[in-house]
Amino acid sequence: MAENNVYGHEMKKHFMLDPDYVNVNNGSCGTESLAVYNKHVQLLKEAQSKPDFMCNAYMPMYMEATRNEVAKLIGADSSNIVFCNSATDGISTVLLTFPWEQNDEILMLNVAYPTCTYAADFAKNQHNLRLDVIDVGVEIDEDLFLKEVEQRFLQSKPRAFICDILSSMPVILFPWEKVVKLCKKYNIVSIIDGAHAIGHIPMNLANVDPDFLFTNAHKWLNSPAACTVLYVSAKNHNLIEALPLSYGYGLREKESIAVDTLTNRFVNSFKQDLPKFIAVGEAIKFRKSIGGEEKIQQYCHEIALKGAEIISKELGTSFIKPPYPVAMVNVEVPLRNIPSIETQKVFWPKYNTFLRFMEFKGKFYTRLSGAVYLEESDFYYIAKVIKDFCSL
């Protein structure tokens, strides 16, 4: 584990967290660093200093530099990446503008994030599609999973497969790179939900080249809130549109041979959001200054594992050890049922923390997230909180 004087509570000075708030739920909202926040505010001020110049010339130019930095981080050609506000935006953009044909099938997982399911259901109803689901447990055998995927491909010949890199709850790491290879083999469109990937799971998208992939920079990369990278394979640039439709779509319609239309479409659709997207470059710089991706990911993985060990021992339950470098852990909790939202609204402020819980296949779990500002003592406190929560 990294030296204590580098990671742990000393790191809190780099974030805007309440000093007494115990944040073991980074996987939900992420944690923006102070350096990134300051850069974001600076960019917002610049955007208002000369609105027309900034909106139409300078901000798009700054955006290009950030795209290049992000491309290096995830091993992609910068021409294949654009920004949108969330993973929900990403999946909606792909599913709602893709050129479906009647009776196409979308295949997905039972642990898909709810908004992915909603978007798939909407596309199904709009275009008269078929929707099928692969059921998985809280742990998967990679070979058996891939065999099941291939069997489904052969049996029902889906048009597209939506697969997670790392599912939200329960936390499951999927062999997404091998899934993409299978999709290529059977000419199936690969749509990869990488919401928890960038800053968390190393990626080389030029090598894997999924058809579509979206990943939230605000979760694990310490970027401003609502900031998502959307990867679109070069061959698919003309298959989707940016939502909402904007001037980029108009340019596309006018040009018989459009140049870099993907970038134009998305920049025009999100012009007012460019400052926060540009600030992602500062997030990459900040993370380099505190040790770099490999060291950060190692610490987050190790402290999440240690936290799960502490809590499961205190509760007398078990946890599912995630593979490296996953920094989210499923811990079983002795709940009989999950308290109401109204009860939780009173409970969590009292304890100055927050956790998510779910029932999955007859067991209750909470999800722990590692972070550079956490230490073992935080998880002893969380164990006490969970005990009190389970007694509600």
Curated annotation (Swiss-Prot):
Cofactor dependency: pyridoxal 5'-phosphate
Molecular function as annotated in GO: hercynylcysteine sulfoxide lyase activity (ergothioneine-forming)
Disruption phenotype: Shows substantial decrease in ergothioneine, accompanied by accumulation of its immediate precursor, hercynylcysteine sulfoxide.
Residues recorded as bearing N6-(pyridoxal phosphate)lysine in the entry: K219
GO CC terms: cytosol; nucleus
Associated pathway: Amino-acid biosynthesis; ergothioneine biosynthesis
Chief localisation class: cytoplasm
Cell location: Cytoplasm; Nucleus
Enzyme Commission number(s) of this protein: 4.4.1.-
Keywords, comma-separated and alphabetical: Cytoplasm, Lyase, Nucleus, Pyridoxal phosphate
Family statement drawn from the similarity comment of this UniProt entry: Belongs to the class-V pyridoxal-phosphate-dependent aminotransferase family. EgtE subfamily.
Function text: Catalyzes the conversion of hercynylcysteine sulfoxide to ergothioneine by cleaving the cysteine residue at the sulfur atom, the last step in the biosynthesis pathway of ergothioneine.
Name of the featured protein: Hercynylcysteine sulfoxide lyase
Organism of provenance: Schizosaccharomyces pombe (strain 972 / ATCC 24843)
Gene: egt2
